[in-house]
Amino acid sequence: MARVKRGVTAHAKHKKVLKQAEGFYGRRKNTIRAAKAAVDRSKQYAYRDRKNRKRTFRALWIQRINAAVRAEGLTYGRFIDGLSKAGIEVDRKVLSDIAIYEAEAFSALVASAKKALEYLKDTTPNAFEGAVK
């Protein structure tokens, strides 16, 4: 078998790593060992933070909805409960956008949630009514 010299492949791999380390500070951008470690770590952070981004955005949407709903005189939890009882299925991202950009439509959603909560309050018997005398 012919002898295979690894210079070409090694150089290509090194170039690839150094290309990914562009913009890094200090030795991490131009020495292979430091660049490889930094690139590996950056990939781990990127993987982790792709998961965290979903949590962060959900929390942001909930905060925005909560602020808009409290202006209407309701809490976030009661609002979500009212929407589910009214049979309205809208995710939090869309609710957040509606609250920001379409205030009238959001007020209508809040009104329908309040209506569903009031209707159920009137029709559901109190569990403690018969027990306490």
UniProtKB/Swiss-Prot annotation:
Pfam families: Ribosomal_L20 (PF00453). Keywords: Ribonucleoprotein, Ribosomal protein, RNA-binding, rRNA-binding. The keyword Electron transport does not apply. CDD domains: Ribosomal_L20. Binds directly to 23S ribosomal RNA and is necessary for the in vitro assembly process of the 50S ribosomal subunit. It is not involved in the protein synthesizing functions of that subunit. It comes from Bartonella tribocorum (strain CIP 105476 / IBS 506). The keyword Ribosomal protein applies. The lineage of its organism: Bacteria, Pseudomonadati, Pseudomonadota, Alphaproteobacteria, Hyphomicrobiales. This is Large ribosomal subunit protein bL20. GO terms for molecular function: rRNA binding; structural constituent of ribosome. InterPro entries: Ribosomal_bL20, RIBOSOMAL_L20_CS, Ribosomal_protein_bL20_C. GO terms for biological process: ribosomal large subunit assembly; translation. NCBIfam families: rplT_bact. One of its GO terms (cellular component) is ribosome. Gene3D superfamilies: 6.10.160.10, Ribosomal protein L20. Belongs to the bacterial ribosomal protein bL20 family.
